[in-house]
Amino acid sequence: MPPANRILTLSIVEGRYAIAKFPCDAEIPAWAAGATFFSVTRTREELSVVTAEASVPAKLDASRGWRMFKVHGPFSFDETGVVAALANPLARVRVGIFVISTFDTDYLLVQHDEIPVAVETLEHAGHKILQLELLNS
């Protein structure tokens, strides 16, 4: 079992991202899969696509301006507290997050204008942030 005060290493991922919503029966848009990073989730209620903001057509209603942290993994499926170790300090300073989990790790998205506060808060909580040179990209 991991410690309650888990310390994690994260990297800032270059670029800005957007989150688009489609009807649940929509086809996955071809433009989404062209980016280096993209995530698609289909539920009974919707199809959500997260991809590079530049890939999303301007006329499409989407939440734009997200920046991304990659949490250095991998993590086993029975590890607990990874997301909580990041979400809890950010919630205390009212920074909203969007989390994507993969087989090996997690990605944490925050709005571009909140990334300085997110970095400061996560570092204050003891986490290590790499690629700070991308902070203003």
Locations of regions flagged by a protein language model:
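A generic structural motif
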Residues: 46-51, 105-111
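A cross-kingdom feature marking solvent-exposed beta-strand/loop segments within repeated
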Residues: 93-108, 114, 132-137
